A protein has these predicted regions:
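A generic structural signal for residues embedded in beta-strands
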Residues: 2-4, 53, 199
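Short, surface-exposed secondary-structure boundary micro-motifs
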Residues: 5-7, 56, 202
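Ferredoxin-reductase
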Residues: 1-49, 105
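Short microdomains enriched in Cys/His and/or Lys/Arg
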Residues: 211-226
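FNR/FR-type flavoprotein reductase catalytic core
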Residues: 37-186
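N-terminal [4Fe-4S]-dependent radical SAM core
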Residues: 8-9, 173, 225-226
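Local cysteine-cluster metal-coordination motifs and their immediate loop/turn environment
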Residues: 162-164, 184-215
Length: 226
């Protein structure tokens, strides 16, 4: 979570996935889309400015149990692509094959694809809602078509908006493929105290994204209560 110091507003930190890191250099990379006052403030910070960081928080994608030669899929919607450069590095190190499904509303939203040049060991499938780049339609439909054509994955990793997750849960459920969703929720404290990032659950009333997630299996989310 990122806090801009010496500002009256915004009051709360902004939560981001770590896109990449350089432990030796003490650096991390964040991919930020300007949406509201918090991200707008970060956008105009001069180079060399100081910000406060809190983290890393929550859990992470499961990679350690994947065997060499396994095949997985990554599904990213828009800025939901943010956590995947780091995940792809871990998959490559484990010799895991991976296809990337990257979706957005239009070609402009898919400009993030250049961040993945040389990182994806398998195929990169682009989808845009308006058909301006790649396959026309939702990225979840692109994955379903691959399943229908015989593609097989041992796991699907995903990050994006909740409507995409709801559709993707049906796709992976029909295919019988386990999945892990990096959920996007507005986080206030980062420790599970404020309950600002709760998601309806199936095994319990609510899941706290910052402490029980943000990586959740689709079976644990009550999609009919979103």
């Amino acid at each position: 979570m990122v806090e801009v110091p010496d500002r009256m507003r915004p009051y709360l930190r902004r939560a981001y996935s770590v896109a990449d890191s350089n432990p030796r250099g003490g650096e991390i990379e964040l991919l930020i889309k300007t949406i509201g006052p918090g991200t707008a403030t970060l956008e105009v910070l001069p180079e060399g400015s100081t910000v406060r960081l809190l983290g890393p928080l929550g859990n992470s994608f499961s990679v350690g149990d994947l065997g060499s030669g396994s095949r997985v899929a990554i599904v990213a919607g828009g800025i939901g692509a943010a956590p995947f450069p780091l995940l792809l590095a871990a998959l490559r190190a484990a010799s895991v094959n991976c296809d990337l499904y990257l979706g957005g509303r239009n070609a402009r939203e898919l400009s993030i694809r250049t961040r993945f040049d040389g990182l994806v060991p398998g195929e990169t499938i682009l989808s845009s809602d308006d058909g301006s780049l790649g396959e026309k339609g939702f990225v979840t439909e692109a994955l379903r078509r691959r399943f229908d054509a015989g593609s097989r994955y041992v796991r699907v990793f995903a990050c994006g908006p909740m409507p995409m997750f709801a559709a993707l849960a049906r796709v992976v459920g029909d295919a019988g493929v386990p999945a892990e969703f990096s959920t996007e929720a507005d986080m206030g404290c980062g420790f599970g105290a404020c309950l600002g990032c709760v998601i309806p659950g199936t095994e319990k009333a609510f899941l706290v994204s910052c402490s029980e997630g943000p990586i959740l299996s689709p079976e644990k989310i009550a999609w009919d209560r979103l």
